[in-house]
Amino acid sequence: MEDQLSFFPGGLRVMPVDGDTKNTRTATKTLSTLHYSLVATHTTASAGLCTLSSDNMTDVQTVLCDVKKVVSSGFDFRRVVETEHHIPVIYLLSTTEPEQMVAGEDTEFLNHLLLKATYIVRKPLDQATMAQLWRVVAWRRCCLEERIPRDSMDDIAAHAGVVGKDGNDNDVIIIEEPQVHFKVVRSRGSRKRQLTINVDSGSSDGADANPRQKLEHKKDAKGPLGQHVASHLQPQEYCTKQQKDLDERRLLSLDSLFLKAILSTLNVSLCNPLILTVPAAFTPQDGMTMNKDKAPMIELPFGLPVDDFLVGQTAYGSAGPSIGAPDDNDDDAAMYAYTSALNNNAAVGSLMVPPIESTFTIIDPIVGTKGEGSVPVVVVSEDQNNAVAAIEATAPNNAELFMMPEQVAVDAPVDVEEGIMFSLESLLGLDEDMIPMEDAGGEATDDSLNIKEGGMEIGWDLDLDYILMNNTNEFAFLDDMAWIE
């Protein structure tokens, strides 16, 4: 009794929180016998917390609370009271089996409360157990006061407005009291509780917040722990480095001369010419088209070997050795490496398709044109000449032997499929060997009129001035016209 009075001179002041009226009367009688005084009695945990938080609250030294009221309240009553008011909370338990008290989600919350409880007393209260309760309360109050001393808090509050001599407050230390926040959420008729405690918010730094940094920090440690962490981080660092190397790998440039050379030969239509892109060092020559701000383009007929067109061309557009035999210049050698790959020599691995065979034979008539508005040139085969000669031999001889039928207009289009075309000599009734034909270019040379016959040279000096064209669109020689007259 003397020890109890040394700690609590006026007696232990207790506040019961219990909804059972019968149990409350029994507890009041037992506590009065032990010289414990009752301050107030509440039926819910929330009502008891409001009384403790009020300004006119009397000095309460301990709280006896039924654990079922704490479960129904939805928050940890003990933790709030002990943290905010530094008053020990003793739980009252009616039965020994928690499953018989609550069900569902409340069972887990009840187990949590009993696990963290300061002290648990069974109901009904036993006088021998309650006689030693003051010792539990005294020890718990001492622990709560040692954690946050009241004198230290008073000193900090007194010096909160003190400023240093240099005008700053670096010498002032401010300690925040631990805060406890509670949230009660009702969902589907049951209560879900979430407890968030911020006791020491400034103790964690940025390195502890990142698990990766934690591992790297432990990697520097010596001993088996550092070796284990290093072996765990090594595969991750290798995979990260390998992925970075793949991302930084540079792709092949599409401006390469080799790619431009081979891409133009792929999927080329049979009706389109082959377009070969050459470096800008080439100067525009015959058969080349120049486009502004672009490399010159060489248009080649499909199937024509590249070497046949580029013979004598160098990287600088001047005359030089064939591409097939590059000199010591590095640019020429590099150009030969690409051009030789495009050469259509029917070699294995050639990039160009073989030449397309001609759809016509050399004995069929061919109509070729050169330039715009030029006269078509007709080439007649030997079989057709023989047929014309046979027809002329059987034809009757008339007075106008040297007169030819009406000619088609020169500018009229020629259709090969509608009729057979004959040469001018066949229509005039002259032999092929007498008057030579003009070449495909329409220009006759001086030597083309000198024909050897029987070892003698017969000179022909035929001029267009001797040929006149009358109104009937017929040709006549001046000598014949004079003889007829």
UniProtKB/Swiss-Prot annotation:
Q: Which residues carry this modification: 4-aspartylphosphate?
A: D66
Q: Which InterPro entries match?
A: ARR-like, CheY-like_superfamily, Sig_transdc_resp-reg_receiver
Q: Which UniProt keywords apply?
A: Activator, Cytokinin signaling pathway, Phosphoprotein, Two-component regulatory system
Start and end residues of each Response regulatory domain: 13-138
Q: Where is the composition biased (Basic and acidic residues)?
A: 211-222
| GO biological process annotation, one example | phosphorelay signal transduction system
Q: Where is the composition biased (Polar residues)?
A: 195-204
Q: Which SUPFAM superfamilies match?
A: CheY-like (SSF52172)
Region spans: Disordered: 195-236
Q: Does the keyword Phosphoprotein apply?
A: yes
What's noted about post-translational modification?
A: Two-component system major event consists of a His-to-Asp phosphorelay between a sensor histidine kinase (HK) and a response regulator (RR). In plants, the His-to-Asp phosphorelay involves an additional intermediate named Histidine-containing phosphotransfer protein (HPt). This multistep phosphorelay consists of a His-Asp-His-Asp sequential transfer of a phosphate group between first a His and an Asp of the HK protein, followed by the transfer to a conserved His of the HPt protein and finally the transfer to an Asp in the receiver domain of the RR protein.
Per its database record, what is this protein's job? Functions as a response regulator involved in His-to-Asp phosphorelay signal transduction system. Phosphorylation of the Asp residue in the receiver domain activates the ability of the protein to promote the transcription of target genes. May directly activate some type-A response regulators in response to cytokinins.
Q: Which family does it belong to?
A: Belongs to the ARR family. Type-B subfamily.
Q: What is this protein called?
A: Two-component response regulator ORR31
Species of origin reads Oryza sativa subsp. japonica
Underlying gene = RR31
